A protein has these predicted regions:
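A glycine-rich, often tryptophan-bearing local segment used as a flexible ligand/cofactor-contacting loop or short
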Residues: 103-185, 248
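Short glycine/proline/serine/threonine-rich loop/turn segments at secondary-structure transition edges
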Residues: 1-8
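Catalytic beta-strand/loop cores that center a nucleophilic Ser/Cys/Thr
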Residues: 148-246
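Enriched for extracellular/lumenal, surface-exposed ectodomains of secreted and cell-surface proteins
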Residues: 10-18
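Alpha-helical scaffolding within the catalytic cores
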Residues: 42-43, 84-87, 113-116, 215-221
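Short amphipathic C-terminal alpha-helix that caps PH/PH-like domains
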Residues: 248-260
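Aromatic-Pro/Gly-enriched surface loop or interdomain linker
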Residues: 19-101, 132-134, 155-156, 240, ...
Length: 261
């Protein structure tokens, strides 16, 4: 199929010949009476070309209300959810990459307790991708090199804000997917949040973006070498984009999974 968005409509025809193409929903909140609402019976299907790196296992530590593991698995990423036992005693070297969901450092005590094992995994050649975290992450010193967050935190609320690639030749924007202007289209709600504000020179910023009238921000995607491995901190709102089926976000995330030293 040609890449794009397609609307599929459903309808049912009864024995008496009457046709129904609506879906019945109920609006029900404590402060109002339940009220039925009929919407068209439609579903949007998005077709995109997403190339995945050769992966056999990707570990994932889920954050609160995090639907990314299911979204990644739906396009073929071999996801293993990492619980307390895996973080404390599991063989992390079996994973080509380990992804930390947004705010997981606030809700997963085993991640906090075993952060040293995660950094050892990176130093031994692993790839760690940490998605947006809040102030406890900074206060705990969980990153391998110093980072800071502003108060209030740096974010880009305009989902259509222009994005500048700081090093267009870097493999992050070419392997396995060629990232271009179209990949920044169709994002939902925001570009990202809890961007790093200051960082150690060991990190390299890969993107620049900002809301209209605000100064440029470069802390949305930082990459650092840690021993023989790679450590990524990103505030990009993948937790919104992947469940929403945004093709460019999938393609960029696939490229993050392909990062190597």
């Amino acid at each position: 199929m040609t890449p794009g968005s397609f609307l599929v409509r459903a309808a049912a025809t009864g024995g008496d010949g009457r046709r129904c193409d609506g879906a019945l929903g109920i609006i029900d909140y404590p402060h109002i009476r339940p009220r039925p609402v009929v919407r068209p019976s439609t579903v949007e299907i998005r077709v995109a070309r997403i190339l995945l790196p050769a992966l056999t296992r990707v570990g994932y530590v889920r954050g609160p209300a995090d639907r990314e593991p299911e979204a990644l698995a739906a396009v073929g990423v071999p996801i293993d959810l990492l619980g307390a036992d895996s973080l404390a005693r599991g063989n992390l070297s079996r994973y080509e990459a380990i992804v930390i969901g947004g705010r997981a450092y606030e809700t997963e005590p085993a991640l906090v307790a075993n952060n040293g094992r995660l950094l050892d995994y990176a130093r031994a050649g692993g790839l760690v991708i940490v998605q947006y975290q809040q102030y406890p992450f900074i206060q705990g010193g969980f990153a391998p090199y110093p980072l800071s967050l502003a108060r209030p935190h740096d974010r880009v609320t305009d989902e259509d804000a222009p994005v500048t690639v700081l090093d267009p030749a870097h493999p992050l924007f070419h392997v396995p997917n060629e990232i271009g202007p179209a990949d920044w289209q169709g994002w939902v709600q925001e570009r990202g949040l809890y961007f790093a504000h200051d960082w150690d020179s060991t990190y390299t910023p890969r993107l620049e973006m900002h809301d209209p009238g605000d100064p440029p921000l470069r802390g949305g995607l930082l990459v650092a070498h840690v021993g023989r491995g790679v450590y990524v901190y990103t505030g990009l709102a993948f937790f919104r984009q992947l469940p929403a089926g945004v093709p460019g976000a999938y393609r960029l995330f696939a490229n993050l999974l392909a990062l190597r030293t």
